[in-house]
A protein has these predicted regions:
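Alpha-helix C-terminal capping/helix-to-coil transition sites in glycosyltransferase folds
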Residues: 13-16
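Short, solvent-exposed coil/turn elements at secondary-structure transition points
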Residues: 8-10, 76
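Conserved SAM-binding strand-loop segment of SAM-dependent methyltransferases
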Residues: 2-7
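Oxidoreductase and adenylate-handling cofactor-binding alpha/beta cores
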Residues: 78-100
Length: 100
């Protein structure tokens, strides 16, 4: 289950893939987000979303049309150290947090 730039669109035929994580250079975010949506996959795209507001809108519209979620995120929120810090803050283990 390895996909390249050349065979990316064949991802639509793989029911084991639910989500595509877009970690390409920002100039390719719109193209591959739209291709993933057309393939019927949800999309998690690294920030920044795209180079232009127009590309952002195209990404949103492609995912809406396909009925798929589009999420823009930064990988840091999923790193173990950061997840642990969030839990400690919520439990009050670090005292009153004033700024992060």
């Amino acid at each position: 289950n390895i996909y390249t730039y050349q065979n990316f669109d064949s991802i639509k035929d793989n029911p084991e893939v639910d989500v595509v994580y877009i970690v390409l250079p920002v100039g390719l975010h719109a193209e591959y987000t739209i291709r993933a949506a057309r393939a019927g996959k949800h999309v998690l795209c690294e920030k920044p979303m795209a180079n232009t507001p127009e590309d952002c809108q195209k990404m949103i519209e492609a995912c809406q049309k396909a009925g798929k979620k589009l999420m823009i995120a930064y990988r840091a929120q999923y790193e173990p150290f950061n997840l642990d810090a969030i839990q400690r803050i919520r439990k009050g283990e670090l005292g009153r947090v004033r700024q992060i």
